[in-house]
């Protein structure tokens, strides 16, 4: 075997390590783990040592993160509800989403961003609600300040989002920082974009004091917006995600297509094009769209033509009970009648088996 072939064989393991990353965010599985904090910390697979240390040291924060997993997965499913891939989760898989996130696609970019944002939101909310020993309301929001409406006093409980961001960065990014490959850098970038998205919608709320609400004095505080705003924002970033390649020294990205702008810290980035998600593909992590409900009158992604990938659809005639003819009665009730509504439900056909697979 010549020296060239020897060199190729030596580099192949490194090449496959570079191109075939594992799904690193095993902490997502905390949603499905119950019991004491020690049991949880020791039984969530894939946590690195720093994550386990934080888990043992801050069991109350871990409970908040675990509750937050349910919230951001529901938000992910809401955003993808009309798409072929609908952010479906797998209860028995510690990666939560299965093999679909092994591909460095824009779906992976969104999930890492929304999960990181969900941790910030969950921790910050728990701080304000007095559920955590390590934090409370934002200690910096004290005294008097000014805005375009004049002078006001900081009061109430300002959301301590800086603590939420700091803890989320330390916990969520810990495993990625141990890696030096392209996927780790992609995940770190999208994690940061998710954290920044939550802070983007931090808003100032105020209460007036004075005779007849004259607002002689104002008390203000900072509050996070509903998580739906963060989800909607990251959905727009998903649709505008930028495909990138590693730069020559392996420390950052450059755009794959020179016609597109360089990604900012707020943008989502990805390396690989997405599969079409039309058929069940175990290796790609795709569940396919057979049996999915589609919209016969839509022209969007939820249309029967797009959702069913041209395979056609089945129509079922169903009835359901609804409230109708509602009337307001003084005071203070709304009374409705029970009505039966008939409607058609359209579901995607399964792919046809090839002729050679048909029974004889």
Curated annotation (Swiss-Prot):
Q: How does the record describe the protein's post-translational processing?
A: Palmitoleoylation is required for efficient binding to frizzled receptors. Depalmitoleoylation leads to Wnt signaling pathway inhibition.
Q: Residues with O-palmitoleoyl serine lipidation?
A: 212
- Biological process GO annotation list? atrial cardiac muscle tissue morphogenesis; canonical Wnt signaling pathway; cardiac epithelial to mesenchymal transition; cardiac muscle cell proliferation; cell fate commitment; cell proliferation in midbrain; cell-cell signaling; cellular response to transforming growth factor beta stimulus
- Reading the lineage from the top rank, the first entry is Eukaryota
- On whether Signal is a keyword of this UniProt record, the answer is yes
InterPro entries found in the cross-reference section: Wnt, Wnt2, Wnt_C, Wnt_CS
Q: Which residues form the signal peptide?
A: 1-25
Q: Does the keyword Membrane apply?
A: no
> Which terms are listed as keywords in the entry?
Developmental protein, Disulfide bond, Extracellular matrix, Glycoprotein, Lipoprotein, Secreted, Signal, Wnt signaling pathway
* Any single GO CC term annotated in Swiss-Prot or TrEMBL for this entry: extracellular space
Which cysteines does the record link by disulfide bonds? 76-87, 127-135, 137-157, 206-220, 208-215, 278-309, 294-304, 308-348, 324-339, 326-336, 331-332
User: Which sites does the entry annotate for glycosylation?
Assistant: 295
A Gene Ontology molecular function term for this protein is: frizzled binding
Query: Where does this one sit in the cell?
Result: Secreted, Extracellular space, Extracellular matrix; Secreted
Tell me the protein family, please: Belongs to the Wnt family.
Q: What does this protein do?
A: Ligand for members of the frizzled family of seven transmembrane receptors. Functions in the canonical Wnt signaling pathway that results in activation of transcription factors of the TCF/LEF family. Functions as a upstream regulator of FGF10 expression. Plays an important role in embryonic lung development. May contribute to embryonic brain development by regulating the proliferation of dopaminergic precursors and neurons.
Please give the PANTHER family that the UniProt record associates with this protein: PROTEIN WNT-2, WNT RELATED
Which named protein is this?
Protein Wnt-2
Instruction: Identify the species of origin.
Output: Bos taurus
């Amino acid at each position: 075997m010549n020296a060239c072939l020897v060199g190729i064989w030596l580099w192949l393991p490194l090449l496959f390590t570079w191109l075939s990353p594992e799904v690193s965010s095993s902490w997502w599985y905390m949603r499905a783990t119950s019991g004491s904090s020690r049991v949880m910390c020791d039984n969530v697979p894939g946590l690195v040592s720093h994550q386990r240390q934080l888990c043992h040291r801050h069991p109350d924060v871990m409970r908040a993160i675990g509750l937050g997993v349910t919230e951001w997965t529901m938000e992910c499913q809401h955003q993808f509800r009309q798409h072929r891939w609908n952010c479906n989760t797998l209860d028995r898989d510690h990666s939560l989403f299965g093999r679909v996130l092994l591909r460095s696609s824009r779906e992976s970019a969104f999930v890492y961003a929304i999960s990181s944002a969900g941790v910030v939101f969950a921790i910050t909310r728990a701080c304000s609600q007095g559920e955590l020993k390590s934090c409370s309301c934002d200690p910096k929001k004290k005294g008097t300040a000014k805005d375009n409406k004049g002078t006001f006093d900081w009061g109430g409980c300002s959301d301590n989002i800086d603590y939420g961001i700091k803890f989320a960065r330390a916990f969520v990014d810990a495993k990625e920082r141990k890696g030096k490959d392209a996927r780790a850098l992609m995940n770190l970038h999208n994690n940061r974009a998710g954290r920044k998205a939550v802070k983007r919608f931090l808003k100032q709320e105020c209460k007036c004091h004075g005779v007849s609400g004259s607002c002689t004095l104002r008390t203000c505080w900072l509050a996070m917006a509903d998580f739906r705003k963060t989800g909607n924002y990251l959905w727009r970033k998903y649709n505008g995600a930028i495909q990138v390649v590693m730069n020559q020294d392996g420390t950052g990205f450059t755009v794959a297509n020179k016609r597109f702008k360089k990604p900012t810290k707020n943008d989502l980035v990805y390396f690989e094009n997405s599969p079409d998600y039309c058929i069940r593909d175990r290796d790609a992590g795709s569940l396919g769209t057979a049996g999915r409900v589609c919209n016969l009158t839509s022209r969007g992604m939820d249309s029967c033509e797009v959702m069913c990938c041209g395979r056609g659809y089945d129509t079922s005639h169903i009835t359901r009970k609804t409230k109708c003819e509602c009337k307001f009665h003084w005071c203070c009730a709304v009374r409705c009648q029970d009505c039966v509504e008939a409607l058609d439900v359209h579901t995607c056909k399964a792919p046809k088996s090839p002729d050679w697979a048909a029974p004889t």
